[in-house]
Amino acid sequence: MLGALQLGVLAACVVVLVPMGMAGWHLSRNKMLFFSGALFITLAVGVHLTPYFPSVTDFVSTVSSVVVIDNRRTCISLLHDVVWDVTKSPGFSTLNNNSVNYDKSWGWTSSSRVSACEFQKLSRSDASDLLNGSWVVVAGDSQARFIALSLLSLLLDSKDMESIRGDLFKRHSDYQIVVDEIGMRLDFIWAPYTSNLTDLTMGFKRNRNYPDVLVMGSGLWHMLHFTNASDYGVSLQLLRDSVVSLLPISPERGTDGPVAGSVPVRSPHVFWIGMPTLINSMLNTEAKRERMTDAMRGAYDRQLQKSKILRQSGGPLLMLDIESLSWNCGVRCTVDGMHYDVPVYEAAVQIMLNALLIESHQKL
């Protein structure tokens, strides 16, 4: 028995070819009339065959979805394409030639691909709208603390930040604040080792209470106190497994549902704070200069890539590439070769906020 599609094609042949063949001879003297009749019959057959084929609307919708996902991926990959302008400040002094003598500004490159993404430096109002009602957790070492400081500096005025800065930078301590105007809660968790971050994520899962945005990073303390790249790599893999268990895997990463053991809750946006460029000659202790070498830094970077914790290698965390930002800002953007001036972390925060806009399909 012929299927519906085959019957439709057979009917089309009969309806189109027979009348056109019969009419061809009689209308050959009037080609305009002949082709008008042929067009009319073809359109009529098209209308009758349409139900037997996939909806054109569905096809266009599918293609559009693929294009949107591809555009999002492209723009995410271009977020760190920034340029720096480092110039002598008006009060420049040759007697005190350090980073405070230089003004730093940055912006995204003007290439056509970057311009098409329409990245923007969010204002206080824009950032407040984006993070309204959110719970943000920033966890890690001193690099994470600078990220938390830069985010709060964007959301609050300088008067409020005076007291916050002192509390936030209390040595090796946690910090929590609620920005009442927008109902945003920020927790900074002192977690210098990757194992601390694993414990933190397991706590979220155990309590079934998850932040909207989770920003974390580690490596500097491990490099200084353990100086063992392979051990660092093992701890990263354990952290990756813990984070993956929290998140439903998106179709963009190749699967349609949650992984085994994941929980059916709103998944947080998760970021990884990369380690900065280390300028060995500027490090302020002998132990740091001896252990935190370029070779050791390279070994730690390779373990980070090998762990597949980052989105770019198939993992769940989107990288905030402090190494790239600090390298491009340069030696005039740091006093101690490890901690960089505020603009570097401000750039990282703006990159993070633009990633949130892209991933949540929002525009301001």
Language-model regions, residue ranges each:
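A compositional signature for long Ser/Thr(±Pro)-rich, low-complexity
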Residues: 1-364
